[in-house]
């Protein structure tokens, strides 16, 4: 609602209150193409979304179900103008499929409405089919190195931008690159020792930095956050934490992306034994939900809109969707209440039936035969990137199992061991043993031949949708914009730009064996990634056009988890900042204690236990900045290997009988009575903060991470909210974490430095928090701040630096 109010106020400033209309843009040349490209497909005689038709003057003036689309002379009252100003993440944004209107198009529509919305007599709008995607040539040669591949990328992008009206900025300096790459690759700002090490390197220190960051233990944590958003991982649902741990371990061991996805789609069993099954459990093993999620997440295609009818915005038919859903049609989610287990298995009955239940009687519906509705790319001869991929997989297979070198591509995909040559993780070894146990008891956790087939079809290197969808997401994560937006909407009607750059990166991704680190290395070493942002004096339309064409860096705010960890890093909050006992305080709390009396309660009623009361939320936001820390190794450790046998031996009838007996038990029980007491304890106020990368996810709605954009991950097509809010400002200004990060602890290096050289301490603070030295003006101001009390002054300076935009935004 606040967004809409702001838009209405903005529109009101440019609207004319009188009936004297301004000069109008030309309808045929300026307005008609915008409406036909972006609106008529969903608002015509056959499709009247929201009750609105926009193909004739009469119909558009009649408005829709809820408001007037156009009020001549009054943009603020015109619902169409309001909705095209909304952000892509806002409900009701128009157009809700394809690209958003650019500022020039919005200005033209606004001027047209201000001028009275003139419409030539007899003109009827028709849907304008998308123009063919423009491409430039891609070199056929194999890049000699990642640096060479990055140079090819830059050249392709330059040629694609030759006719664009955009400004190209220079590349950033070394320290800015250090900060940007460290934030993007390992999810926090660089530390002072890391800055010094980087500056001491000779030669191409940027390449050395990239190699170091890609090998850093935090790389897996940072990119697990990326994958958790993409896969909608939720700790609160069955298998959520196990899936999160599986993704983390897969990235840590450099498991190829296609192998990971195969495991996610085909997994069966229990999450504790086969953590990849969390993807299937995440959608309750529902074939319809899984079909929509699989296509949208892994292929970037929103075929889910064809679940109930032919796709209203694309060419997919409802039968296409049902054919895809049939691959999941025999998958079952089984729950055993007595054993406390939930698992997936494969049944014998197809649950996906055609025609849909609202279009036929039950006896008329037939099981659907699975069909993959996406076509692979066909080549007259095997292209270079596929030849490289096949050769790489053959080498991997020979290294892991001693292959003959004559296997087919499918055999190479099935046999490759992504962990060949790597040190074995004992936890994963145990998990693999547990997985082999599942095969012994295959009658319980039956594998899915249908889903295994689907996994192979989706990850086939000739299926261009698969690689392009992932590359588009990674590119947007690193650069700020995707080649297609929304990121999961590859469609003939979507605005795909810089298609040749996307093609090149996708092919290199396939050729690398779907290696995430190789993809990121190419991007980070490119000049495109190193571009500086445009200055504030550049007109908005020029800046937005340049950012969209990847010739200037957009302003990107840190992810919530990255901002959290950067505050922890800047403030030395991962370790104690004071000696033990240096900050003792008294804290009161309420606990439940026994009274010595007994009371009678009904059978089955919960028995009170001695426990502390749930903590109140503090005004300083402390409880909104902490959360449950996850131990991924513990989550992946198999437990109770004998559980399968116990499940087999207990008949369903026996389990049900026990459950019914427990439910019917109603005899009264004698239990202890408890009362609430307030107690006061002395605590050492010397807090440490864990990394946000391994918190249970998503965080509660009021948590720091959610306030700074972490999505709920409840539905498809949900992306991070990068907009700013007053709540964010208050949490940074008044939050406990910012306060603790600002305080100067006696165990911090800067504490001793303050005693010796205040000017040097100021330089240290700037480099530690902003990864740069202060200007002379900033140094003068800081010295004045430290003049009365150096330690309090330094705390104030650090607090100010943590709250500035320069800290929160990626340079």
Model regions and ranges:
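Positively charged n-region of N-terminal signal peptides that target proteins for export
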Residues: 1-8
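A structural supersecondary motif
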Residues: 697, 707-716
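Solvent-exposed helix-loop boundary motif
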Residues: 22-114, 118-158, 175, 180, ...
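Bacterial N-terminal signal peptides
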Residues: 8-19
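Primarily short, surface-exposed interaction patches in extracytoplasmic proteins
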Residues: 145-180, 184, 189-218, 223, ...
């Amino acid at each position: 609602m606040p967004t809409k109010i702001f838009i209405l106020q903005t529109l009101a400033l440019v609207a004319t209150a009188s009936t004297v209309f301004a000069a109008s843009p030309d309808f045929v040349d300026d307005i008609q193409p915008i409406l036909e490209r972006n609106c008529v497909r969903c608002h015509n005689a056959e499709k009247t979304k929201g009750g609105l038709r926009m193909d004739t003057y009469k119909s558009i003036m009649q408005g829709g179900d809820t408001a007037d689309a156009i009020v001549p002379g009054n943009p603020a009252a015109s619902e169409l103008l309001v909705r095209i100003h909304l952000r892509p993440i806002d409900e009701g944004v128009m157009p809700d499929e394809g690209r958003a209107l650019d500022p020039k198009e919005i200005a033209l529509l606004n001027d047209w409405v201000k001028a009275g919305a003139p419409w030539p007599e007899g003109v009827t709008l028709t849907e304008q089919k998308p123009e063919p995607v423009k491409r430039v040539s891609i070199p056929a040669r194999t890049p000699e190195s990642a640096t060479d591949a990055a140079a090819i990328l830059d050249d392709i992008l330059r040629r694609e931008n030759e006719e664009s009206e955009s400004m190209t900025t220079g590349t950033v300096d070394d320290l800015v690159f250090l900060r940007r790459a460290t934030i993007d690759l390992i999810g926090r700002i660089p530390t002072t020792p890391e800055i010094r090490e980087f500056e001491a390197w000779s030669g191409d220190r940027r390449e050395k930095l990239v190699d170091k960051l890609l090998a850093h233990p935090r790389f897996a944590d940072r990119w697990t956050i990326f994958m958790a958003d993409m896969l909608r991982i939720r700790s609160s649902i069955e298998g959520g934490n196990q899936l999160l741990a599986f993704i983390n371990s897969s990235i840590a061991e450099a498991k190829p992306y296609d192998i990971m996805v195969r495991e996610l789609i085909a997994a069966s069993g229990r999450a504790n034994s086969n953590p990849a099954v969390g993807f299937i459990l995440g959608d309750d093993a529902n074939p319809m939900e899984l079909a929509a999620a699989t296509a949208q997440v892994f292929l970037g295609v929103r075929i889910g809109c064809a679940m109930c009818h032919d796709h209203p915005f694309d060419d997919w038919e409802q039968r296409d969707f049902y054919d895809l859903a049939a691959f999941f049609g025999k998958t079952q989610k089984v729950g055993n209440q007595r054993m406390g287990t939930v698992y997936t298995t494969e049944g014998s009955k197809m649950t996906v039936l055609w025609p849909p239940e609202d279009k036929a009687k039950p006896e008329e519906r037939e099981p659907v035969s699975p069909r993959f509705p996406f076509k692979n790319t066909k080549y007259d001869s095997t292209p270079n990137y596929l030849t490289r991929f096949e050769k790489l997989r053959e080498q991997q297979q020979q290294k892991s199992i001693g292959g003959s070198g004559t296997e087919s591509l499918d055999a190479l995909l099935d046999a490759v061991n992504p962990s060949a040559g790597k040190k074995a993780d004992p936890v994963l070894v145990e998990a693999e043993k547990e997985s082999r146990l599942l095969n012994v008891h295959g009658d319980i956790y039956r594998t899915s031949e249908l889903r295994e087939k689907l996994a192979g079809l989706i990850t086939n290197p000739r299926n261009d949708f698969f690689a392009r969808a992932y590359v588009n997401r990674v590119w947007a994560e690193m650069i700020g914009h995707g080649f297609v937006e929304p990121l999961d909407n590859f469609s003939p009607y979507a605005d795909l730009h810089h298609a040749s750059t996307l093609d090149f990166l996708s092919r290199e991704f396939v050729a690398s064996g779907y290696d995430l680190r190789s993809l990121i290395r190419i991007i980070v070493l490119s000049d495109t990634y190193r571009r500086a942002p445009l200055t504030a004096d550049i007109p908005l339309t020029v800046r937005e056009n340049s950012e969209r064409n990847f010739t200037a860096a957009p302003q990107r705010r840190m992810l919530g988890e990255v901002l959290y960890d950067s505050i922890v890093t800047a403030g030395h909050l991962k370790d104690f900042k004071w000696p033990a006992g240096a900050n003792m305080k008294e804290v009161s709390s309420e606990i439940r204690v026994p009274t010595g009396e007994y009371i009678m309660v009904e059978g089955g009623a919960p028995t009170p236990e001695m426990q502390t009361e749930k903590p109140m939320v503090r005004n300083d936001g402390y409880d909104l900045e902490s959360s449950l820390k996850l131990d991924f190794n513990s989550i992946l450790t198999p437990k109770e290997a004998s559980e399968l046998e116990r499940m087999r031996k207990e008949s369903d009838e026996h389990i049900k009988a026990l459950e019914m007996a427990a439910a019917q038990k109603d005899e009264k029980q004698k239990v202890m009575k408890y009362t609430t007491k307030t107690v006061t304890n002395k605590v050492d106020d010397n807090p440490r903060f864990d990394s946000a990368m391994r918190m249970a996810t998503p965080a509660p709605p009021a948590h720091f991470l959610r306030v700074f954009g972490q999505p709920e991950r409840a539905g498809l097509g949900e992306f991070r909210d990068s907009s700013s809010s007053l709540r964010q400002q208050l949490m940074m200004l008044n939050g406990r974490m910012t306060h603790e990060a600002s305080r100067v602890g006696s165990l911090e290096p800067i504490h001793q430095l303050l005693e010796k050289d205040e000017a040097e301490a100021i330089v240290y603070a700037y480099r530690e928090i902003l990864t740069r030295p202060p200007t002379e003006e900033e140094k003068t101001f800081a010295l004045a701040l430290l003049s009365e009390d150096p330690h309090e002054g330094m705390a104030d300076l650090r607090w100010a630096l943590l709250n500035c935009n320069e800290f929160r935004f990626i340079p």
